[in-house]
Amino acid sequence: MPIEREYGVDENAFLVSKTDTKGRITYCNEPFLNIVGVKQGDLLGKPHNIIRHTDMPRIIFKLLWERIQNKEEIFAFIKNKTLNGGFYWVFGNITASLDQQDNIVGYYSVRRKPNAKAIEIIKPLYAKLLELERDGGIEASKKYLLKFLEEKSTSYDEFINNLQRF
């Protein structure tokens, strides 16, 4: 099924989901369910990557997993697919959920409407990263991303957060 129709995230909505340590969905709120186009029971226990859009470079998720497995938060612009053939962009914050002994027990994601100007900058970057991954694997896209950030004299976090505030 082609993924062509774009759905916009409501300005005031927060799309919330929680997963276990393997990335299987344990909770999602109504705004998240509504945009994905399913009922709660349809997603519980399913891998969160069920909504991963094919336009997303793997390097972004590699960076995401490295960060959250080290108990560090990460912000990212993410293009997800709906389960009815559409897609939507979000500005997401993903963190590890910890127990009282500081062990990771799952992951928590809060996503909101991204800055439209930021998405126009992110789209060609992600397209380039995807192209590099097809030709040279994830290491090629990682190398490009690091060089891209270095040329801008910024870190990943600064770049992403500044785009959202842009």
What do the predicted segments below correspond to?
Residues V105-Y108, R112-F166:
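Juxtadomain coupling helices with adjacent low-complexity linkers
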Residues I3-L129:
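Sensory/regulatory domains in signal-transduction proteins
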